[in-house]
């Protein structure tokens, strides 16, 4: 009496031993081993390569935009400069850019409106934050801001819509700014710090694309100039070369891994496993 064909159902009682291996699986594995010994001729399309480079650049630009939060905070908290002039200048630039764009007016208006609501709400709550922060040690503030920063970068990098920040990333940004603003001395400093961070990380990214050549140049000049002043030119050069390595070399390594290893590792699962659930 012939046995029924083996099925890939672990919960089904079958007339096969527990260590049974299907012959088709063995043939597939042998064929893949033979192919792995040959020179790989798989290639990625130019569009796929360009998308990989763009993803690396987008993440790098996200790091730059996030670093503006700490640059602004250091400008106000450590150096004690007046935050009103840069706030007015940045607000003027934001207003000009928003008027020159041809995006739907209603959507842009809603983005600005929601950001302003958050700003004035935080301005109202800033005295409360100041009173609460008196009982909080600075080490706790720095630790909390560090983890909020990592969380913010992770969320905004994994957002599918790159032209509009998600609600979660906006809330994390507001929480991060609220934590840092508790160290500032006056309500005006808190308001200006919050307004600058919201414009740089919420409003302006909705208008400016990462492919814009002017924005990355200005961002890099500001960030590396600040690093030169704050850390010195040696550390600035180390960070600069690490950034160049990340933008130029790592994408090539990732493309090489994508061509030679990634598909090969997933061939077995994608071919053998069912694409849709198999029911009894």
From Swiss-Prot:
Biological processes per GO annotation: fungal-type cell wall organization; GPI anchor biosynthetic process
Keyword Transmembrane helix annotated: yes
Q: Which Pfam families match?
A: GPI2 (PF06432)
Q: Where are the transmembrane segments?
A: 54-74, 76-96, 109-129, 136-156, 190-210, 221-241
Keyword Aminoacyl-tRNA synthetase attributed: no
Cellular compartment(s): Membrane
Identify the keywords attached in UniProt to this record, alphabetized: Glycosyltransferase, GPI-anchor biosynthesis, Membrane, Transferase, Transmembrane, Transmembrane helix
Record-stated family: Belongs to the PIGC family.
Question: Which proteins does it associate with, and in what oligomeric form?
Answer: Component of the phosphatidylinositol N-acetylglucosaminyltransferase (GPI-GlcNAc transferase) complex composed of at least GPI1, GPI2, GPI3, GPI15, GPI19 and ERI1. Interacts with ERI1.
Name of the protein: Phosphatidylinositol N-acetylglucosaminyltransferase GPI2 subunit
- UniProt source species: Saccharomyces cerevisiae (strain ATCC 204508 / S288c)
């Amino acid at each position: 009496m012939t046995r029924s064909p083996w099925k890939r159902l672990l919960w089904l009682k079958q007339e096969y031993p527990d260590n049974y291996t299907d012959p088709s699986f063995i043939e597939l594995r042998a064929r893949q081993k033979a192919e792995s010994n040959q020179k790989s001729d798989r290639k990625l399309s130019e569009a796929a390569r360009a998308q990989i480079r763009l993803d690396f650049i987008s993440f790098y630009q996200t790091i730059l935009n996030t670093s503006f939060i700490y640059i602004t905070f250091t400008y106000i908290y450590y150096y004690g400069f007046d935050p009103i002039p840069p706030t007015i200048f940045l607000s003027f630039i934001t207003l000009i850019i928003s008027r020159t764009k041809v995006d739907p007016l209603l959507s842009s208006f809603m983005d600005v409106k929601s950001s302003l609501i958050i700003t004035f709400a935080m301005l109202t709550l800033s005295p409360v934050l100041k009173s609460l922060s008196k009982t909080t040690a600075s080490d706790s503030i720095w630790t909390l801001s560090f983890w909020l920063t990592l969380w913010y970068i992770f969320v905004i990098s994994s957002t599918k819509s790159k032209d509009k920040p998600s609600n979660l990333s906006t809330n994390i940004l507001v929480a991060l700014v609220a934590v840092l603003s508790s160290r500032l001395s006056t309500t005006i400093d808190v308001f200006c710090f919050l307004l600058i961070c919201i414009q740089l990380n919420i409003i302006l990214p909705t208008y400016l694309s990462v492919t814009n050549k002017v924005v990355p140049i200005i961002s890099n000049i500001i960030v590396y100039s600040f690093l030169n002043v704050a850390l010195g030119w040696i550390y600035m050069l180390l960070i600069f070369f690490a950034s160049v390595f990340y933008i130029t070399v790592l994408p090539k390594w990732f493309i090489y891994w994508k061509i030679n290893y990634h598909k090969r590792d997933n061939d077995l699962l994608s071919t053998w496993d069912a694409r849709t659930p198999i029911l009894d």
